[in-house]
């Protein structure tokens, strides 16, 4: 069997994936900071690494998947104060919203979903070890900082020297730091900050810095050396670089073997940002597009490439997914079928996924298989199509339910009951040999985005275009 190859950001090349413990994969992904609704960029992280963990499990690995929740930081405190609510009320509300969004997108829950506020003792312990190892110091302002110049490997993930990083990054001047690149491990409490945002520590009251949260949680749940760490490309520096410095500085050993980063999301070929007014929450998108269409759209691009969000691309994804479901509509597929990896399409699908999770090529195999199903009407091939799609979290619904579903209603507000009523009126018109009226009803439905298919025996099926 071919080996799984993954592009390792740390090595800057595709490498054969060899887990530390044979047959077992320990995997950590940086999750959401819960002070607002999740946006399309978050959707990509959720779906991409859901695809990764699904494929690892389908390949026979015992996977422990951890994705954290950041439920304390400056933005959270600021938003809670602005809203006049507690930090806990704010974060619990947006954690629930995040779960709703993830569930809609077919994202399986991680095995562990630690909240930063639950791991403060572990963070304090790690900061203490860093200080003991000469890698951390308490500054005049009360903050505890990491001394980057004391860690020889700093910059290895981004591939830059300290000099390059200082020149290329916008680092705020801070007289309390020994080096502009030094980053905070423990933030001293400010007088005007709420009591629930501070914890006691050997360095005085305060709260953890963002970077130490992920190091402490991942090492506590997966061990100080684990297989796979993922996140968006925007986290490569400084967040992931700082995680390496913290974790390896505390343990003295390798932190993570393989680093994965998904590409950026762009909107109509521009960077997505609130300032440009092209910022979309997952909820905004799901008001217009079926969640499975959004998942399909995300997986249609390779995870390392930038993803260009536009209505044109989402409409195209909807039509493409409709083609796959249409192939399954009238051919009985075995429920809960497992992929046949010895069948030619199964072999090519696995080859694609084993090549750095090449979902665009894997999807091309699905369309080839759909063409064969349309030609042969083979239940075995239909089962294979549904099974391979299922590995990616796609094609898991009843085909008729997908084809007749849709978000909201059709263009003129028709729901399923109204469509059926018009089909019945068309049937009555045909029985009365009023073919002009029957054709008019069909044309009106088509204009409303409803496609009719007349079947033998006087049966009419329909789907949304």
Swiss-Prot record:
Enzymatic reactions: tRNA(Cys) + L-cysteine + ATP = L-cysteinyl-tRNA(Cys) + AMP + diphosphate
Keywords for the protein's UniProt record, in alphabetical order: Aminoacyl-tRNA synthetase, ATP-binding, Cytoplasm, Ligase, Metal-binding, Nucleotide-binding, Protein biosynthesis, Zinc
Motif placement: 'HIGH' region: 32-42
Cofactor descriptive note: Binds 1 zinc ion per subunit.
Residues bound to Zn(2+): 30, 214, 239, 243
GO molecular function, one term: cysteine-tRNA ligase activity
Localization (cell): Cytoplasm
Motif window: 'KMSKS' region: 271-275
EC number from the UniProt entry: 6.1.1.16
Subunit (UniProt): Monomer.
Membership in a protein family: Belongs to the class-I aminoacyl-tRNA synthetase family.
Name of this protein: Cysteine--tRNA ligase
Organism: Ralstonia nicotianae (strain ATCC BAA-1114 / GMI1000) (Ralstonia solanacearum)
Gene this protein is translated from: cysS
């Amino acid at each position: 069997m071919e080996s799984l190859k993954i592009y390792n950001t740390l090595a800057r090349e595709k490498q054969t994936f060899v887990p530390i413990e044979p047959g077992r994969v320990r995997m950590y992904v940086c999750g959401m900071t819960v002070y607002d609704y999740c946006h399309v960029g978050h959707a990509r992280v959720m779906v991409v690494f859901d695809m990764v963990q699904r494929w690892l499990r389908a390949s026979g690995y015992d996977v422990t998947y951890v994705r954290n929740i950041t439920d304390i930081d400056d933005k959270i405190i600021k938003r809670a104060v602005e809203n006049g609510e507690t930090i806990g009320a704010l974060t619990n509300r947006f954690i629930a919203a995040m779960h709703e969004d993830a569930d809609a997108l077919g994202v399986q829950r991680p095995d562990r979903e630690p909240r930063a506020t639950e791991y403060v003792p572990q963070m304090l312990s790690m900061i203490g070890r860093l200080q003991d190892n000469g890698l951390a110091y308490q500054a005049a302002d009360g903050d505890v900082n990491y001394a980057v110049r004391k860690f020889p490997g700093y910059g290895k993930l981004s591939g830059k020297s300290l000099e390059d990083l200082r020149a290329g990054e916008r680092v705020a001047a801070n007289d309390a730091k020994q080096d502009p690149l030094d980053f905070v491990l423990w933030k001293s409490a400010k007088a005007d900050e709420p009591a629930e945002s501070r914890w006691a520590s050997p360095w005085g009251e305060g709260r953890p810095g963002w970077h130490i949260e992920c190091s402490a949680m991942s090492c506590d749940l997966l061990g100080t050396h684990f297989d796979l760490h993922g996140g968006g490309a925007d986290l490569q520096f400084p967040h992931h670089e700082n995680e390496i410095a913290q974790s390896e500085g505390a343990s003295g050993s390798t932190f993570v073997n393989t680093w994965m980063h998904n590409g950026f999301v762009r909107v109509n070929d521009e960077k997505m940002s609130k300032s440009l007014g092209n910022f979309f929450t997952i909820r905004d998108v799901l008001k217009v597009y079926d969640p499975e269409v959004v998942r399909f759209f995300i997986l249609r691009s390779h995870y390392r490439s930038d993803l260009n969000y536009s209505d044109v691309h989402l409409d195209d994804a909807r039509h493409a997914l409709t083609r796959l479901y249409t192939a399954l509509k009238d051919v009985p597929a075995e429920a809960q079928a497992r992929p046949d990896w010895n069948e030619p399409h199964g072999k090519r699908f696995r080859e694609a996924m084993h090549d750095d999770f090449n979902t665009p090529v894997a999807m091309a195999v699905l369309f080839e298989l759909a063409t064969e199903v349309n030609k042969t009407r083979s239940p075995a091939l239909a089962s294979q199509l549904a099974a391979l799609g299922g590995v990616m979290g796609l094609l898991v619904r009843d085909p008729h339910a997908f084809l007749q579903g849709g978000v909201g209603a059709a263009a003129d507000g028709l729901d399923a009951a109204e469509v059926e009523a018009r089909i019945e009126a068309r049937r009555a018109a045909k029985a009365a040999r009023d073919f002009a009226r029957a054709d008019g009803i069909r044309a009106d439905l088509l204009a409303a985005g409803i496609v009719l298919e007349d079947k033998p025996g006087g049966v009419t099926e329909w789907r949304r275009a």
